[in-house]
Amino acid sequence: MPTFETPTAIILTVDVPMGYVEIAATDRNDTVVEVTPSNPKRSGDVQLASEATVIFTDNTVAVRVPKKLSLFGPGDSVGVRIALPTGSAVTVDAAYATVRTTGELGESRVTSAYGAVTLQHTASLTLNSAHGEVDVHRVAGDLDATTGHGRLRVDRVDGEARIKGSYGDIGLGEVGGVIDARTSGGISVDRAGSDVSIRSAHGAIQVREVSGGTVRLENANARVQVGVPAGMAAWVDAASQHAAVRNELTAEPGPRADDRTVELRLRNNYGDIIIHRAI
């Protein structure tokens, strides 16, 4: 079990073809890496774990598990567990593997072809998930996410959120910066702290509470719903070609110079548009 003295945050890279990756960030002055066979009784797993390399140089720890082609039966699999200092930057490339992190990480990049991804806390995050569910508690910087088949849930993004999705639903909690999202599935936002631009082909769009700026929501076949806080004036431009537009906001005199305002530009083809006060 390699152990390295790392009194400050490090840079970690992990490349795992099959298995699982667990990374724990705590206030510590060393980094510990453990690579074990997923099944200690399976010779292929044992052999693959023995061939893994762990290299430490220039404050960077690189963990690499070789890729092996399996023509018959399940492929060889390993588990990678890493304990490192808080604030470390992490890059994970996982083909068929689950990825889980705890503690506060620095700038992070996670690529997963098949498998669930669970991240507790990162600085900026670049995520690419093809197949599998993704859960992120907090991104303290910007979020750049590309998803394929699988649900994405991010509880909080302090910065901007840029998302490209295919078929899975997307759920965002509170986002402090600009939101720019394109997907074929549904997308929901609990609270948007800045401008919003969301487009969906088939899934419902819901922004429960806006904070101002310009909100552009476009859909083709499902509902568009947006909530405006009490006391905020809204400029509304909404149209649905083959469904209803329901504006539950009451008409009021124009806003004063110091009033909070939001500009809503909403479009739909076959789904309703609903505008209401945020609850």
What is each residue range found by the language model?
Residues M1-I279:
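Intrinsically disordered, low-complexity terminal regions
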